[in-house]
Amino acid sequence: MNTTLFHPYSFLLLGIPGLESMHLWVGFPFFAVFLTAVLGNITILFVIQTDSSLHHPMFYFLAILSSIDPGLSTSTIPKMLGTFWFTLREISFEGCLTQMFFIHLCTGMESAVLVAMAYDCYVAICDPLCYTLVLTNKVVSVMALAIFLRPLVFVIPFVLFILRLPFCGHQIIPHTYGEHMGIARLSCASIRVNIIYGLCAISILVFDIIAIVISYVQILCAVFLLSSHDARLKAFSTCGSHVCVMLTFYMPAFFSFMTHRFGRNIPHFIHILLANFYVVIPPALNSVIYGVRTKQIRAQVLKMFFNK
């Protein structure tokens, strides 16, 4: 079979169908979000690296999150801006698969690190005397390796399942980026395997959410048992940033899934915007949330920029 029919030379990304006339203006907030994500997370990484007092598990996990976020932003927004501002809609088949790979990899890693951060909060509040015994450097290193390897194992089949599909000349993707099911739906063959595997991958995110909820139920029980009002406030402050980041990541994903599954009468551009929020907004807000709410990070950033 002709390889250009089996696998097209390139795909065309339409951007946000229905808002083509506004692409120029839509690009500006996306550009601002991109700058915030990259500069904010680089700042957090720099602060954690240079301040030895922050070299403990909570900030190690934050450093991992701040390493993932620029990757997720870079996987999506530069190509979006090319589509919005310069009508550079074409993306090679290999480039589209590469983009899909990194979007799903970074998304999986972000979910995994949020579980690790929930566990860190759980140990810090429910068993503080054993914190340094439980979360040793070795344990944190193993968790960091798992954060990378688990999504890698689950994402590689996405690429393989796309490579097995013929496309018969279909190459228009009504989206701003290439993701697994968006590419698979262009195929002229059965995508049943892709759908089943996609649901299995989503179940991993559901498992992560359940693990986080269980952790926070136990954390809340422990907090309400504290006799001191100040101790309760300190406990809430310890995990407040993580809760905000968790909601920022999972809520857009939840609404995107629900509108895709049940919102058949919702305009298509709403689906695309929600899918963009899911991968674009969290990387920017994470750095802002931790920069504002975490006292140690905020103090170091202020010192770095305003102390003479």
UniProtKB/Swiss-Prot annotation:
Bilayer topology: Multi-pass membrane protein
Cytoplasmic side stretches: 46-53, 120-138, 216-235, 293-308
Record topology, Extracellular segments: 1-24, 75-98, 160-195, 257-271
GO molecular function: G protein-coupled receptor activity; olfactory receptor activity
Keyword Isomerase belongs to the record: no
Keywords: Cell membrane, Disulfide bond, G-protein coupled receptor, Glycoprotein, Membrane, Olfaction, Receptor, Sensory transduction, Transducer, Transmembrane, Transmembrane helix
Entry's localization field: Cell membrane
A GO-annotated cellular component: plasma membrane
Positions of disulphide bridges: C96-C188
Taxonomy, superkingdom: Eukaryota
Pfam families attached to this UniProt entry: 7tm_4 (PF13853)
Glycosylation positions in this chain: N2
InterPro entries: GPCR_Rhodpsn, GPCR_Rhodpsn_7TM, Olfact_rcpt, OR51/52/56-like
Annotated transmembrane regions: 25-45, 54-74, 99-119, 139-159, 196-215, 236-256, 272-292
Entry-linked PANTHER family: OLFACTORY RECEPTOR 52E1, OLFACTORY RECEPTOR 56B1-RELATED
Family: Belongs to the G-protein coupled receptor 1 family.
Functional description taken from the UniProt entry: Odorant receptor.
Protein name: Olfactory receptor 52E1
Species whose genome carries this gene: Homo sapiens
Gene encoding the protein: OR52E1
